[in-house]
Amino acid sequence: MQVIRLAVTPPKDPMLPPDPTMIRDAEILSQLTDTIARFVRERLVPAEQHVAETDTIPDDIVADMKAMGLFGLSIPEQYGGLGLTMEEEVLVAFELGRTSPAFRSLMGTNNGIGAQGILIDGTEEQKQKYVPALATGEVIGAFCLTEPDVGSDSGAVKTRAQRDGDHYILNGTKRYITNGPHAGLFTVMARTDPEIQGGGGVTAFIVEGDTPGISRGKADVKMGQKGAHTCDIIFDNCRVPAENIIGGKEGVGFKTAMKVLDRGRLHISAICVGVATRLIEDAVNFAAERKQFGKPIIEHQLIQAMLADSRAEMFAGRSMVLEAARSKDRGEKVSLDASCCKLFCSEMVGRVADRAVQIHGGAG
């Protein structure tokens, strides 16, 4: 399946018309979203059971994802990506969300948290050196913020980075690192100034995956999302060149991380909307075929009410995400709105999934 490598813009969304100021070429983005929707339908959905059973995405599918440019959706064209705006990215994510999250997880870090720190705050030299390989999928990126004792209190990073000449020596453990087992490039948040409490003493580093002193823990065993891998990343006297500080400046890594997470929250919110859309479609199709009491169960009012509630919540989430994405594209601060989107959409898709299971009854 061939990638469409042109400047792209949103088509007329069937549920909420896009902001005209964000449109660059609606026809080309329509081609891109149609191509991805077909790829999801014809290649990814049929492979879902295999991925769930083997915890592995087939190599031929990964190759197709690379050929289509999916690893560089949000990476600017000058670094080999498609250069989608935030609104365009969430429109694509709506389609990618209609299949197992494992597929999106593999390439999601390259588009998001694995590359955005470099793109947002990195030097031009850093961008030229590292981003093109992320855009093609040649290298998988990962984002190292969470630690065994550092979760929601993300400014309390304990991993240390001590200056040693023209290098820094990193020591510490990062936990639940998405794509950690496969990553060839890490964005690492480490404390360079232990005297400063909170995020002010944290610096962002670019660390290559084959750097001596890096080891990877055993892949986490999860109840769901088979095929999407996480693990601990351990730094033991890992020497990183000082030139690999993102942007060349100490003490601003926490700010970089927060900027990265704004985009990531909107992307994940859009994926939740896509998952909810798939759940509703599957529930409608099942309810139309399943008969009880002499008629399809979709004709029973209780089933209709559950579908209506799910559809209304999905629409609300979709509208929220698109509005926040447009605000980000206009250069507005969206930290609060992006967090609201992720909170609502992640809880919304849980409720939709619960109703879908109920509609399927014993088959759920």
What are these regions (language model features)?
Residues V150, R175-P181, R263-H267:
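Glycine-rich phosphate/pyrophosphate-binding beta-alpha loops
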Residues A115-D121, F143:
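Flexible, glycine-rich active-site loops centered on histidine and acidic residues
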Residues L84-T85, D153-G155, N179-G184, G198-G201, ...:
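Short glycine/proline-enriched turns and hinge-like loops at secondary-structure junctions
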Residues A156, P212-R239:
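Flexible, small-/acidic-enriched active-site or ligand-binding loops
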Residues T159-A161:
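A structural signal for short hydrophobic beta-strand segments in well-ordered beta-sheet cores
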Residues G137-L145, M189:
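A short, Trp-centered hydrophobic/proline-enriched beta-strand micro-motif
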